[in-house]
Amino acid sequence: MRKEHDFLGELEIPDNAYYGVQTMRAMENFQITGYTADPLFIKALGMVKKAAALANMKIGLLDEKIGNAMVQACDDIISGKLNDQFPTDPIQGGAGTSFNMNTNEVICNRALEILGRPRGDYNYISPNNHANMSQSTNDVIPTSIRVCALMRAEQLIVALENLADSFDKKGEEFKDVLKIGRTHLQDAVPITLGLEF
């Protein structure tokens, strides 16, 4: 176990955890659903944080050595390798601050590890000052939700196309089966069952 502290005091963090004290507080305070974040949302968080790190390096705000390690950490998040490091309950109050801080801590601790430094060495790479540089929760969470929705939309489009194909096949299968049509809750002219699809 390693020890991390915040304004409320000190907590022990499991040695294998990339998350830190803010995530532990969220786990203590928000045990509501028993679920964790959707993997696609975690991926979107990694993408948004990677874009921020790249932009901050490009404009000279973020040291390249630290920034490149953070980008590599974001790539690990995007790939799904670190999904188990996001234990925060989806229902956690506020505007997603716990998700944002969970992500910041994972990025920092993975980047610290990449650079050969111990996890929790926030004087070197800080969740607030480095991983959250030029951002706020109100930037990160809505943007990540939109990115996640776009990725989900791709899956939805494929599913809807498959559904339309199924309807076409059923329409063809039942094109010769007659039935009574209905309109205004009354029987109407005969139609084929295939036309229902």
Where are these regions (language model features)?
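Conserved, well-structured ligand/cofactor-binding cores
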Residues: 1-197
